[in-house]
Amino acid sequence: VNKLNLTNKTDYKTLSNIVPDCWIYVQDTGVKLGRIQIFNNWSPYMVSHPDNTVWLGLEYFCEEGDDFWNMEDGECINFAVDELIKMGVISRNEVIDAHRERVKKAYPAYFDGYQYMEYIVDYLNKFDNLYCVGRNGQHRYNNMDHSMATAFETVKDIISGTHDKTNIWNVNTEKEYHEEKK
């Protein structure tokens, strides 16, 4: 988009004074949208013209084969743009381009078996050239920062020639970060 209708009201400096968030979780029950990513805030190098465009990623939570998943790309893009307009995030005339990407199994499904993770990790670590990174690689609820951190740790290990992957598996194990079931 050319610009957002949201402006930076914080003391944090951002390019073009856009909101400083990398992602915004949507709590509006009147829309299906789950999360907005603002790629300009991940890195200005991810955006071709960061001074006069804002690149957004929109996440919709659905299941492979459901109505939303099967929606035609053009229809889905129009649906998403309409939701952003409804929420006041953008104006229709600011939309420059759009692309839809379906990501299978983007979020791991957490079912039975977690009591065996230690054994699974021990087994997987026997393969020197296998590095488990990100949500699906570690079958763990990592946010984007944690997922990227597992990749960075993996690169460090490969460059240094170490085969101890403890540092990779230790990303996002801080107890105070995790939500508890009540």
Q: What spans do the regions from the language model cover?
A:
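A short, terminal or domain-edge coil/loop segment
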Residues: 76-94, 144-161
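C-terminal lid/capping helical subdomain adjacent to the catalytic/cofactor pocket in oxidative enzymes
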Residues: 101, 111-182
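Short Gly/Pro-enriched loop/turn and capping motifs at secondary-structure junctions
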Residues: 63-65, 105-106, 137-139
